[in-house]
């Protein structure tokens, strides 16, 4: 019987992967990858900064558009409220996600 052929079945492969994951999870050096966690945190902080800037720009554009429509096009208030609320939801999404994750 060829033992290498038996590794193609799902059960031995699953057991081998589970053993490797348990081994890597118990060793903190492998889990933290010697400083890699700090690099990932700084990268994600940069992404959060960009998302905050984009959210401020989105809310600003929505409010400017709503003001233009109300003042110069004499639009209905309900049409403008939808755009302002959508802009606020898009703009607040980064802060809502930060609140939920921390």
Curated annotation (Swiss-Prot):
GO cellular component annotations of the record: plasma membrane
Keywords: Cell membrane, Membrane, Signal, Transmembrane, Transmembrane helix
Cellular localisation: Cell membrane
Residues in coiled coil: none
Coarse class of the protein's main subcellular location: membrane
Transmembrane segments: 45-65, 77-97
Superkingdom of this protein's organism: Bacteria
Protein name according to UniProt: Type IV secretion system protein PtlA homolog
Disulfide bonds: none
Organism annotation: Bordetella bronchiseptica (strain ATCC BAA-588 / NCTC 13252 / RB50)
Topology versus the membrane: Multi-pass membrane protein
Family per record: Belongs to the PtlA family.
Residues in the signal sequence: 1-31
InterPro entries for this protein: TrbC/VirB2
């Amino acid at each position: 019987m060829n033992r290498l052929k038996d590794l193609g079945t799902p059960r031995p492969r699953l057991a081998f992967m589970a053993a490797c994951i348990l081994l890597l999870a118990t060793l903190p050096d492998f889990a933290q990858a010697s400083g890699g966690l700090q690099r990932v945190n700084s990268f994600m902080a940069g992404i959060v900064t960009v998302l905050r800037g984009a959210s401020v720009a989105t809310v600003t554009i929505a409010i400017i558009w709503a003001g233009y429509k109300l003042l110069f096009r004499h639009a209905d208030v309900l049409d403008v409220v939808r755009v302002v609320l959508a802009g606020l939801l898009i703009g607040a999404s980064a802060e809502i996600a930060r609140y939920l994750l921390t």
